[in-house]
């Protein structure tokens, strides 16, 4: 039976579509899915064009490669490859509806795997350097195969081995793989490890719980202290604003007080200035008045000097009393003598008319009375003398200011003898 299967395998062996060879260590496919030998596939992959027929050879050269892989790594890699093959077989079985092919204990699957491990009597090792590329092999499970024929072949071979098939309702044996029961010691060890893990998790949970409680406490304290701090800050700001307001109020009052003081001082200065102006005006007016009095005094001595001479001739006894007064007047009056000479040189007279009026007013009463009795001739002499000193009156006024009090003081006695003269005559 096995020989017939191998014969069927040989008849279905593929050939290269480019060079028509059937002896190659590895089969490849092009972009269109056509089967190529290893040489044609590599040439097409490297050069991008089909391999020419002139390069075809029937001798396959093999290079000797020494495997330096460690035994333990080789075993692990082999186990991984077997597991991968089993997964691929399971996937193909699911696609084709083959349930019995998924079981690794199925002898038909094992026989199929064993038949796939040889090509033309040469074992195919997946660890060989030829299979390093990702190009699929003809017998690689990645290449789609007509599973209907294979399933028929396997169905024919299974009864010959006498292996009973697994019933669909049979449960898997607990002795297979991971379903084996654990011993008491293993259970105790697993329980102890779980308890240790639980205790560790509890400790970690307590730590997290304590940290969380601490954070909550700090947050509560911070939230409780924030209003107090804010209130304290607001109070401090209010106090500072109140102090600033009081200070500004004091400064305002002080400025008002200074303003009032300055106003009072200004009023006082204005009053003083007004008084000074009034005093100056009064002094100026007094100077004019004194000058007029001086002019009157200057005009009167001539009349007085003339008047006592007549009573002396008539009545010598009463005329001796007013003699000292004219002497005092005569001492002050000699100054106007040089004035007429300097007057034309310095400046013209300002206004002689008011002086003449004032000088003429006191003259008629005292001078006219004695002249009627004795001599009318001297009266025109007094009138003629009056206009002479008037031009120099304004200029001589400053020189005569110290003598003004004497004239004012001497004015009463001057009038007295003039009045007594008519009494004596009467």
From Swiss-Prot:
Q: Where is this region: Disordered?
A: 70-143, 159-178, 306-426
SMART domains attached to this UniProt entry: ZnF_GATA
Entries under InterPro entries matching the protein: Asd-4/GZF3_helical (IPR056998), Transcription_factor_GATA (IPR039355), Znf_GATA (IPR000679), Znf_NHR/GATA (IPR013088)
| Keyword Glycosyltransferase applies | no
Kindly list the GO molecular function terms attached to this UniProt entry.
Answer: DNA-binding transcription factor activity, RNA polymerase II-specific; RNA polymerase II cis-regulatory region sequence-specific DNA binding; zinc ion binding
Q: Which UniProt keywords apply?
A: Coiled coil, DNA-binding, Metal-binding, Nucleus, Transcription, Transcription regulation, Zinc, Zinc-finger
UniProt keyword Secreted present: no
User: Zinc finger regions typed GATA-type: which residues?
Assistant: 16-40
Describe its assembly.
Answer: Homotetramer.
Function description: Transcriptional regulator that functions in sexual development; disruption of asd-4 gene results in agenesis of ascus and ascospore with macroscopically normal fruiting body formation. The GATA-type zinc finger domain binds to DNA sequences from its own promoter region.
| Name of the protein in question | GATA type zinc finger protein asd-4
Species? Neurospora crassa (strain ATCC 24698 / 74-OR23-1A / CBS 708.71 / DSM 1257 / FGSC 987)
The organism's taxonomy opens as:
Eukaryota, Fungi, Dikarya, Ascomycota, Pezizomycotina
């Amino acid at each position: 039976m096995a020989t017939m299967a191998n014969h069927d395998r040989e008849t279905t062996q593929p050939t290269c579509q480019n060079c028509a060879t059937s002896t190659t260590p590895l089969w490849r496919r092009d972009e269109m899915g056509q089967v190529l030998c290893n040489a044609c596939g590599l040439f097409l992959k490297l050069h991008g064009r089909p391999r020419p027929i002139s390069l075809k050879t029937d001798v396959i050269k093999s290079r000797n490669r020494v495997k330096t892989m460690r035994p333990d790594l080789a075993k692990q890699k082999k186990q991984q490859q077997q597991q991968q093959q089993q997964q691929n077989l399971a996937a193909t079985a699911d696609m084709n509806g083959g349930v019995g092919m998924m079981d690794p204990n199925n002898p038909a699957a094992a026989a199929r795997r064993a038949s796939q491990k040889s090509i033309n009597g040469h074992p195919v090792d997946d660890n060989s350097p030829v299979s390093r590329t990702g190009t699929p092999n003809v017998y690689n499970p990645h290449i789609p195969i007509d599973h209907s024929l294979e399933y028929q072949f396997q169905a024919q071979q299974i009864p010959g081995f006498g292996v009973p098939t697994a019933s669909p309702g049979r449960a898997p044996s607990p002795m297979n793989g991971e379903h084996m029961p654990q011993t008491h010691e293993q259970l105790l060890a697993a329980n102890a490890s779980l308890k240790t893990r639980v205790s560790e998790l509890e400790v970690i949970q307590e730590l997290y719980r304590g940290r969380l409680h601490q954070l909550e406490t700090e947050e509560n304290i911070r939230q409780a202290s924030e209003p107090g701090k804010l209130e304290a800050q607001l109070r401090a700001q209010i106090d500072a604003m109140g102090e600033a307001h009081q200070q500004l109020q004091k400064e305002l009052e002080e400025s008002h007080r200074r303003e009032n003081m300055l106003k009072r001082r200004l009023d006082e200065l204005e009053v003083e200035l007004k008084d000074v102006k009034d005093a100056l005006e009064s002094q100026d007016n007094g100077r004019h008045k004194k000058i007029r009095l001086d002019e009157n005094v200057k005009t009167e001595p001539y009349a007085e000097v003339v008047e006592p001479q007549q009573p002396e001739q008539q009545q010598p006894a009463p005329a001796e009393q007013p003699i000292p007064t004219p002497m005092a007047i005569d001492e002050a009056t000699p100054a106007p003598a040089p004035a007429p000479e300097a007057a034309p040189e310095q400046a013209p007279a300002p206004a002689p008319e008011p002086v003449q009026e004032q000088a003429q007013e006191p003259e008629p009463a005292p001078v006219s009375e004695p002249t009627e009795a004795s001599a009318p001739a001297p009266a025109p002499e007094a009138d003629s003398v009056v206009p002479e000193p008037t031009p120099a009156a304004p200029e001589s006024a400053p020189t005569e200011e110290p003598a003004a009090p004497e004239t004012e003081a001497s004015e009463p006695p001057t009038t007295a003898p003039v009045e007594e003269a008519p009494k004596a005559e009467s």
